[in-house]
Design a protein with these regions (language model features):
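Two-component/phosphorelay signaling modules centered on CheY-like receiver
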Residues: 16-35
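Acidic, metal-coordinating helix/loop segments flanking the phosphotransfer/catalytic sites
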Residues: 36-54
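Receiver (REC) domain active-site loop signature in two-component systems and cognate sites
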Residues: 61
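C-terminal output helix
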Residues: 114-123
Length: 141
């Protein structure tokens, strides 16, 4: 699956290698702009200053966890970034973690290590949801 080059993605992981692999996979899928953040706090700052079409994030990070980041992101006071689709990347995909992530508004869950094809499928589902939501809203304009 090829993603249009104008998409912007934010990759958040405290592990530099995991960030680099995820960013490379997004580029391979055709994502035009990939920004990397090494911590949850850095991701919050990035989301406050520029729009992203999707965010990939780790669940366990030392400063602000994935759960904490989702609580901030999905808060209505956070503004337009609140609607940013999120793919959780985790090596700890226990039932409790996945349920909690979904409750907090995570759109897709990928278990590390994942393939570029698996990431492409998750992106396709997210982009399909976004397109459907936009179509649904246009009916009421």
């Amino acid at each position: 699956m090829i993603i249009p080059g104008r998409l912007r993605a934010l990759v958040v992981d405290d592990n530099a290698y995991a960030r680099a692999i995820s960013a490379a996979s997004l580029k391979k899928l055709g994502v035009g702009d990939v920004v990397q953040a090494d911590a949850g706090a850095a991701a919050i700052l990035a989301l406050m200053t520029e729009p992203f079409d999707v965010m990939l994030m780790d669940w366990y990070m030392p400063d602000v966890s994935g759960a904490g980041l989702m609580q901030v992101l999905r808060d209505p006071r956070f503004g337009a970034a609140q609607a940013t689709p999120v793919i959780l990347m985790t090596a700890y995909a226990s039932r409790d973690n996945v349920v909690r992530a979904r409750e907090l508004g995570v759109n897709e869950v990928l278990v590390k290590p994942f393939t570029t094809d698996q990431l492409g499928i998750a992106l396709g589902r997210i982009l399909g949801q976004a397109a459907q939501a936009a179509a649904d809203q246009s009916i009421f304009l």
